[in-house]
Amino acid sequence: YNLFGQLSEILTKEINGKTLLADFSLSNQNGFDTKEYYTDETIIYNNKSHNPQVVTDKYSMNTVYIWGYNNMYPIAVIKGATMSQVSSILNEIDKLESMPFPTLATEELYRRLSYIQGALVTTYKFNPYIGITNCIKPNGESVTYEYDSFSRLTSISNNTGVLNKYYYNYKK
């Protein structure tokens, strides 16, 4: 855990098949040798917002998160890229994350980040305190979410048409 109590690393220990789970207890009384453990994930947090910034899985695949709306919602998730690759394309990441509303349109953000060779980019647009309004997936598909005046999801659609519609019927 880091200084803010957030999970920073996940370790796995392989044990022989004869040990019952009920008999297994993790003790750090005398310290433990981390060489016996395998790192499943490493999480690096943003120093200012304390949001996850880079998650590295056990195969060393990075996922970079860019936050927006005053660091409340993720506006981009980039799999297969490093933070330095993302920073070289978006030199205003800190500014983007601290703005109440992103200064880059979702489409422009997606277009810029798609230049990272081999990366899978997903971008998001939100209506704060209501929900997601748009998502552009790695394959370029744009999905739109619509809400009613009570902030309830009413429809999900993409380039081909309406995927789902939601109706809220009340008994009188």
PLM segments and residue spans:
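Beta-strand elements of repeat-based all-beta scaffolds
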Residues: 1-57, 61-137, 142-172
